């Protein structure tokens, strides 16, 4: 018997059974061939007994259908031993992703009994590559704490909400990956709400709703993304409500995300909203300028794009919506550059991304100029306005004054007052100084023009 026969069996069963039933009972089986014997290894005793009572006879019939009567192998069922994971099994041959409704990810150190629970988890999303900032600091600290001690705190369920593209899904996957790495005896599921609903519908059609319930209520950590998709789906909400209750009664961790605060989600039952809010609710806001700049720098390293801080700052100043918008900008830069190693300039970024930039101009204030210049030079506004005479502070201060003169209608005296009560002579000196420096120093000229472009865009 060739290994392809077992592959055919798997594909047949995958089309015949519900996604939950297949993922829960069939896919974890490991196959080994010895002479004319097919040995199936169940991951644990519970699975062994269930397969023996419910599937073994059908599996024997299926083998006969795919084999000649004289070549049908003897079928044996055993409980998997730890060393079996090191062997190359035939049913680990790649099944096409478009056939699978649920992607199962695990590593060689993960116990077999947990493999079926780690569905849809993206291993690329970790805490290490998540960019922290003021807008997501509380969410990050809380979820990081939960990941290292799930179900052992008062943050249950944890409800994260915010607009699309702010990192909620990234944090859910980071939790899952951390738990699988450090607590691989814990059973964990990440699932998008639409997939949960679809799995439930399929289970109802195939009369396997009890398996569906056992699957979701037997986990230790449940991560549900985009809960707003349950709106106006009465039966799905009913099942979700009982699933949440079952897990909370066992002190199992639940983390939920949404694009809105629980009470503002239309079409969700009041009792379910109450469950969402009985733990801790945290809002994630759009990233601020510094965080957006850090995100671009970090992503540029991943994309292998030669992006300087000043160019990243320029892009971040003009793209303010969400992280996906920033990633889209980098993709566009990469697509339009001659090579990955090309040095990206402000002008190149502007020409490439001008369609993405927020074009409506806002009135420019001196306070806004002070903020942008301070961020650009990595100094605080307090230092910018202080009496400090360090060159690293004086030059940004003078540039800020010169830009204020150029971009606002304020008098020299009015500008001076905004700079901690300085007089008009100080501002005039700063403007003349920066003008002369631009003629001699290309770096000063470049900084001045870059800041003008940032503030004018």
UniProtKB/Swiss-Prot annotation:
Gene3D superfamilies: 1.10.1750.10, 1.10.8.60, 3.30.300.180, P-loop containing nucleotide triphosphate hydrolases (3.40.50.300). CDD domains: AAA (cd00009), Bac_DnaA_C (cd06571). Disulfide bonds: none annotated. Residues 338-457 are annotated as: Domain IV, binds dsDNA. Residues 1-71 are annotated as: Domain I, interacts with DnaA modulators. Keywords: ATP-binding, Cytoplasm, DNA replication, DNA-binding, Lipid-binding, Nucleotide-binding. Oligomerizes as a right-handed, spiral filament on DNA at oriC. Belongs to the DnaA family. Domain I is involved in oligomerization and binding regulators, domain II is flexibile and of varying length in different bacteria, domain III forms the AAA+ region, while domain IV binds dsDNA. Plays an essential role in the initiation and regulation of chromosomal replication. ATP-DnaA binds to the origin of replication (oriC) to initiate formation of the DNA replication initiation complex once per cell cycle. Binds the DnaA box (a 9 base pair repeat at the origin) and separates the double-stranded (ds)DNA. Forms a right-handed helical filament on oriC DNA; dsDNA binds to the exterior of the filament while single-stranded (ss)DNA is stabiized in the filament's interior. This is Chromosomal replication initiator protein DnaA. It comes from Buchnera aphidicola subsp. Baizongia pistaciae (strain Bp). The gene is dnaA.
């Amino acid at each position: 018997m060739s290994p392809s026969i077992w592959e055919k069996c798997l594909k047949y069963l995958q089309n015949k059974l519900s996604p939950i039933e297949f993922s829960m009972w069939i896919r974890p089986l490991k196959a080994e061939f010895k002479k004319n014997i097919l040995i199936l290894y169940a991951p644990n005793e519970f699975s062994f007994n269930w397969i023996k009572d419910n599937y073994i006879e059908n599996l024997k019939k299926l083998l006969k259908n795919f084999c000649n009567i004289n070549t049908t192998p003897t079928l044996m069922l055993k409980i998997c031993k730890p060393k079996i994971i090191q062997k190359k099994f035939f049913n680990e041959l790649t099944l096409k992703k478009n056939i699978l409704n649920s992607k199962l990810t695990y590593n060689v150190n993960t116990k077999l009994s947990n493999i079926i629970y780690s569905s849809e988890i993206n291993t690329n999303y970790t805490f290490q590559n998540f960019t922290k900032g003021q807008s997501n600091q509380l969410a990050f600290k809380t979820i990081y704490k939960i990941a290292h001690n799930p179900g052992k705190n008062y943050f249950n369920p944890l409800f994260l909400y915010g607009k699309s593209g702010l990192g909620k899904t990234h944090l859910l996957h980071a939790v899952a990956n951390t738990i699988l790495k450090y607590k691989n005896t814990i059973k964990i599921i990440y699932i998008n709400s639409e997939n949960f609903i679809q799995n439930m519908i399929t289970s109802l059609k195939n009369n396997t709703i009890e398996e569906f319930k056992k699957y979701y209520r037997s986990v230790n950590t449940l991560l549900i993304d985009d809960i707003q998709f349950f709106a106006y789906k009465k039966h799905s909400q009913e099942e979700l409500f009982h699933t949440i209750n079952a897990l909370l009664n066992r002190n199992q961790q639940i983390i939920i995300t949404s694009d809105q605060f629980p009470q503002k989600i239309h079409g969700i039952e009041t009792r379910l909203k109450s469950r969402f809010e009985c733990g801790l609710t945290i809002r994630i806001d759009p990233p601020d300028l510094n965080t957006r700049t850090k995100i671009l720098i970090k992503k540029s390293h991943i994309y292998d794009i030669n992006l300087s801080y000043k160019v990243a700052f320029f892009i971040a100043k003009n793209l303010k919506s969400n992280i996906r918008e920033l990633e889209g900008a980098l993709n566009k830069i990469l697509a339009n550059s001659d090579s990955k190693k090309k040095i990206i300039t402000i002008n190149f970024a502007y020409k490439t991304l001008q369609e993405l930039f927020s074009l409506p101009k806002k009135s420019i204030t001196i306070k806004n100029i002070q903020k942008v210049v301070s961020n650009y030079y990595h100094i605080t506004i307090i230092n910018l306005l202080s009496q400090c005479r360090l060159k690293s502070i004086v030059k940004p201060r003078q540039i800020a004054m010169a830009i204020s003169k150029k971009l606002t209608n304020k008098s020299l005296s009015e500008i001076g007052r905004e700079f901690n009560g300085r007089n008009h002579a100080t501002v005039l000196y700063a403007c003349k100084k920066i003008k002369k420096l631009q003629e001699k120093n290309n770096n000063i000229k470049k900084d001045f023009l870059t800041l003008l472009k940032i503030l004018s865009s």
